[in-house]
Swiss-Prot record:
This is Putative uncharacterized protein YPR123C. Keywords: Membrane, Transmembrane, Transmembrane helix. The keyword Transport does not apply. It is found in: Membrane. It is a multi-pass membrane protein. GO terms for cellular component: membrane. Its main location: membrane. The keyword tRNA-binding does not apply.
Amino acid sequence: MSISIPEELLLSDDDIPDMPDMLESEVVCALAELVGVLLIDIDIPDIELLPIDILAIDDIVDANVLLALDIASMLIDDMLDNIVLLALDIASMLIDAILDATVLDALDMASIFMLLPIFIPSILNVKYNTLFFIFYSILPTNVI
């Protein structure tokens, strides 16, 4: 005995939005189990009740698809939040590294300026105090 189901009661491919394959297969398995349980309760000789049961199954399928889409969107939101936080962490680490390198470069430059008065007198054979005074009088005040 074959049972024909009216076309307007069936879901088309356009009614169900696309989902990731893994999530879709889990939803399909869950729906198959649910539909199987509901179909057992259908009394086959009462053909008049069959469309009502199919409508109930259709509503359950729609609700499960919407629930699956909600879960998928929450998972995607969590992934995006984690990616944004990771990107911000990486950006802050890079900024810290750049600032550290800049500070180290500034300290290197300051140490070079501080050591110059010590080495120049030996090269030029000039008294240390005189050159020290001349060198620091030439430098701007914010460098000292």
